[in-house]
């Protein structure tokens, strides 16, 4: 058995770097177009969901061929800086477990041949959630203005806070069987063999992203985005395993034994039956 339980939390004030500022920078560097990020089919376009969610929840917007975060101001040379002090928080929670259940049976044939049978089941669960929060210590430092092509201000607001959350979950079940035989054909001599069937594990993965950005002021508004429900189902099969052994006892002097185990890892198989892209 195993467990994967963990809670992490961090908080602090920062006036030099911003989570959504980095998101905007990476989206600019990757060359994602605003029309692609804002499309109703953006989550199926191959663009990482993080940037789609961030853009559609107004965490960053295009400006002079780059993206600028709601927490940033822009110099004349198109370089960006954090506009003021931010109260930043990060949280992560993981949980999960792995268990193996086995049913055993044994047979004895005249104290000469012994047979053991195991029927087993593996189960696993895992979930991962993390969030990033940024809140303006003073919203007046974070003026956001949108202008038309003539330079006229068409919208004026102040960044107040944002939250980005990502969730992932996995569950799986696998089945296997083992059989072992030990035989004592004559005194002092013992032979044995074990066989484990391939383990076929069915695994289901799901994930989801969501974002929210709050603006205050004259044209203040709350923008939010929620990704579709991503899902991937796949099957993982491990190879058959077998082992053989023989031993002979030389009275009170010692024992001679030989063992051999075989397993062809080239027979491992992975097959996906449903897949929704997310990188």
Give the positions of each predicted feature.
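Outer-membrane beta-barrel porins/channels
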Residues: 2-279
């Amino acid at each position: 058995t195993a467990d994967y339980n963990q809670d992490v939390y961090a908080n602090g004030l920062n006036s030099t770097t911003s989570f959504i500022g980095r998101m905007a920078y990476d989206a600019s560097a990757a060359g994602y177009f605003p029309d692609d990020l804002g499309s109703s089919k953006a989550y199926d376009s191959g663009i990482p969901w993080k940037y789609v969610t961030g853009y559609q929840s107004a965490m960053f917007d295009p400006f002079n061929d780059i993206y600028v975060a709601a927490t940033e101001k822009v110099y004349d040379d198109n370089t960006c800086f954090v506009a003021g002090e931010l109260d930043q928080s990060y949280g992560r929670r993981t949980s999960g477990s792995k268990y193996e259940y086995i049913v055993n049976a044994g047979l004895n044939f005249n104290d000469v041949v012994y047979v053991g049978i195991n029927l087993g089941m593996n189960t696993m669960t895992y979930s991962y959630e993390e969030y990033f929060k940024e809140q303006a210590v003073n919203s007046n430092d974070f003026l956001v203005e949108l202008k038309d092509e003539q330079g006229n201000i068409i919208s004026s607001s102040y960044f107040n806070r944002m939250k980005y959350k990502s969730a992932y979950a996995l569950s799986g079940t696998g089945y296997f069987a083992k059989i072992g035989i030990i035989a004592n054909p004559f005194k002092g001599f013992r032979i044995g063999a074990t066989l484990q069937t391939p383990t076929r594990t069915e695994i289901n993965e799901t994930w989801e992203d969501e974002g929210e950005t709050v603006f205050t002021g004259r044209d203040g508004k709350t923008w939010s985005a929620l990704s579709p429900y991503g899902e991937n189902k796949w099957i993982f099969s491990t190879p058959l395993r077998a082992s053989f052994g023989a031993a002979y006892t030389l009275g009170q002097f010692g024992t001679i034994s030989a063992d051999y185990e075989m397993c062809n890892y080239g027979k491992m198989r992975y097959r996906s039956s449903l897949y929704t892209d997310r990188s």
